[in-house]
């Protein structure tokens, strides 16, 4: 048979195709062996060679030995050529078999298998159960059964919602206020109640009814002890830590009345409403006095006593005051002249005519109870500006001409053309400025007093009046 015969060429082509098929199979098997070898070598490098493989024939050998034996145990072709990755041409169709088992990826990474005990990232299941996701709440409130993680949280909760009493400090005055039967702080104004002491204190510092009360004479009907008080009062611990003040002295009888639940009468809604109305009236009466530039502070730094003492002195010296209002003032007309407006008659001077209102000493035995009993109770602040019955004007409704123990309104100038009879609020609640017109018998805004006299009564504004008006504004702004 010649080389160029058709049978020889077909035989050569068939052998060549069979060799190519066998070589493709060998290349595929070699690639699989190389990938397995690289995987084992990489796992050994990552684990530092510490993982051991169990030899099925017995004994332990390292992964490097396994890889070497796996590489050396590759079958050879019929022509004696080893099946290594380096041999480029291998002509054999013998299948490739690995003699040693290869560890799975889960076993190399240390994951849990079916035969090994349960582990989680190197931690046993028993240890993992000792570490819960959320901490246990061990502090329980005995009032509302709420749970708290820390002791500080429970303490803040009790101080905010279950504290028996709170202390409101306003200037030199110190009020000890207790919760009512519903567990809330009720103000004397009767408008709202609060559960949190800080909210109640914010309201109390701006409430005229609360500010008009004497810290040492708080009515027991308003601030009485609830029947189920098992917490230690807050005032006992705080009074030991602070410096005593003269205004903090409480009579023993009053303190016992507030601390002993058996001595407190039952709750009476009508009595509580009457006391609340009396407190509102006290706030209305206290705003009627004029606060002079310099008031002797020889009392207990209480605006209540200072206002009432000033009213008593003004009534005692009624006959010496050059501008004191006569009892029959509403029945007589007053001549409007410019004589009283001389510069020497300026009350804002150091030696003015009204300096006699300030004595060297004021009586200190003035109680707010007298003014509450003698003064009419006004339901609202605006009702004091209305006309009073029996032919009296609005000044009488404001308290001028009442008994000497009441807080009165001291007139600055009796017969001014603008009839400016103003008041400065002692408690500085709203910077309220009020002017009184004698012709209209009504109260108007102080800023509109001059325009009111010019437009409604057609009176000319003299220079003296402008001077007095400007001085009064300076006095109000000081």
Swiss-Prot record:
Point to the regions of Low complexity compositional bias.
Answer: 62-71
Q: Per UniProt, which keywords does this protein have? A: Activator, DNA-binding, Metal-binding, Nucleus, Transcription, Transcription regulation, Zinc, Zinc-finger
Q: Where in the cell is it found?
A: Nucleus
The record ties this protein, via InterPro entries, to: Znf_C2H2_type
Gene Ontology terms: cellular component: chromatin; nucleus
Task: Spell out the Basic and acidic residues composition-biased ranges.
Answer: 226-238
Disulfide pairs? Answer: none
A single GO BP term for this record reads:
regulation of transcription by RNA polymerase II
Residue ranges of the region described as Disordered: 1-71, 104-135, 218-270, 311-336
Start-end of C2H2-type zinc fingers: 139-162
Which GO terms label this protein's molecular function in UniProt? Answer: DNA-binding transcription activator activity, RNA polymerase II-specific; RNA polymerase II cis-regulatory region sequence-specific DNA binding; zinc ion binding
Q: Bias category Polar residues: which stretches?
A: 7-33, 43-55, 115-135, 260-270
Q: Does the keyword Aminoacyl-tRNA synthetase apply?
A: no
| Summary of the function given for this chain in its UniProt record | Acts as a DNA damage-response activator of rhp51. Binds to part of the DNA damage-responsive element (DRE), (5'-NG[GT]T[GA]-3').
Q: What is this protein called?
A: Transcriptional activator protein rdp1
């Amino acid at each position: 048979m010649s080389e160029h015969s058709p049978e020889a060429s077909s035989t050569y082509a068939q052998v060549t195709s069979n060799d190519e098929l066998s070589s493709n199979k060998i290349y595929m098997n070699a690639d699989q062996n190389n990938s397995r070898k690289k995987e084992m070598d990489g796992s050994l490098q990552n684990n530092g060679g510490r993982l051991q493989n169990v030899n099925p024939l017995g004994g332990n050998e390292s992964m490097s030995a396994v890889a070497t034996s796996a590489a050396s145990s590759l079958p050879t072709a019929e022509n004696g050529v080893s099946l290594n990755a380096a041999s480029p041409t291998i002509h054999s169709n013998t299948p490739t078999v690995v003699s040693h088992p290869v560890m799975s990826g889960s076993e190399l990474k240390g994951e849990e298998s079916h035969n090994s005990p349960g582990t989680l990232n190197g931690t046993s299941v028993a240890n993992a159960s000792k570490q819960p996701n959320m901490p246990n709440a061990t502090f329980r409130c005995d009032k509302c059964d709420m749970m708290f993680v820390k002791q500080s949280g429970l303490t803040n909760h009790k101080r905010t919602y279950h504290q028996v009493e709170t202390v409101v400090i306003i200037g030199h005055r110190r009020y000890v206020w207790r919760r009512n039967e519903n567990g809330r702080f009720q103000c004397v104004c009767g408008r709202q109640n609060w559960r949190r002491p800080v909210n109640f204190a914010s309201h109390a510092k701006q409430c005229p009814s609360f500010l008009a009360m004497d810290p040492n004479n708080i009515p027991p009907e308003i601030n009485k002890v609830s029947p189920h008080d098992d917490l230690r009062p807050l005032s006992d611990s705080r009074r030991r830590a602070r410096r005593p003040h003269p205004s903090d002295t409480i009579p023993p009888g009053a303190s016992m009345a507030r601390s002993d639940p058996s001595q407190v009468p039952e709750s009476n809604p009508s009595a509580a409403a009457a006391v609340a109305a009396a407190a509102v009236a006290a706030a209305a009466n206290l705003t009627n006095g004029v606060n002079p530039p310099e008031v002797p502070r020889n009392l207990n730094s209480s605006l209540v006593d200072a206002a009432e003492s000033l009213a008593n002195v003004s009534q005692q010296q009624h006959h010496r005051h050059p501008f004191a209002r006569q009892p029959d003032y509403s029945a007589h007309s007053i001549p409007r002249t410019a004589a009283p407006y001389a510069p020497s008659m300026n009350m804002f001077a150091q030696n003015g005519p009204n300096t006699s209102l300030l004595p060297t000493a004021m009586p200190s035995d003035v109680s707010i109870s007298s003014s509450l009993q003698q003064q009419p109770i006004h339901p609202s602040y605006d009702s004091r500006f209305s006309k009073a019955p029996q032919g009296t004007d609005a000044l009488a409704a404001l308290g001028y001409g009442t008994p000497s123990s009441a807080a009165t309104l001291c007139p600055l100038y009796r017969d001014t053309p603008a009839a400016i009879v103003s008041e400065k609020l002692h408690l500085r609640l709203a910077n309220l400025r009020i002017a009184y017109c004698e012709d209209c018998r009504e109260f108007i805004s102080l800023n509109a007093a001059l325009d009111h006299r010019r437009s409604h009564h057609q009176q000319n504004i003299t220079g003296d009046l402008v001077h007095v008006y400007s001085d009064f504004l300076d006095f109000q702004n000081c």
